[in-house]
Amino acid sequence: MIRGATYCLKGHFVSAEDPPPRDWDQIQEAALREFDEDQGRKLPAFCTDCGSENISTCNRCQKKIAFNNGRRPQYCGWCGSPFPWTVGALSAAREYTDELDQLSSEDKTALKATFDELTTDTARTPLAATHFKRFMEKVGSPAAEILKKIVETVLTEAAKKTIGL
């Protein structure tokens, strides 16, 4: 049984379902708790940090978002679709890249091409992270720091390590 999680559209963690019960007493307690929750004690519809709508299912396939011990997923495990917080961060990074006067249009295109690779652990992730790091050296601070902050929330641990975050 998959343990579900609730996040807001911007990616703030809201809650996780209780772990599955292990014995009959726990099953009964969980059933009573669910009954009580259905009588009015539900999660808020909106995030208390930012006011965005809370979701517990994928917008595309409607399957529940799997809880992964506090590690926010970037993509749906059922259909592979990016979650809204992933789309939002990548969109903001692309928009910000277009504003960087230090880069040519070819460089901007190449930098934007690294973003998707930085959100998944593949054989191309270290290469994309190395390219990203080079572009950050080229644009310099504070632009590089701003762009790093935008993408940091959706990068894999391997990408963060290579980039130095």
Regions of interest found by a model, annotated:
Residues 1-144, 162-165:
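Short amphipathic alpha-helical segments that predominantly mediate membrane engagement
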Residues 145, 150-165:
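C-terminal, charged low-complexity interaction regions
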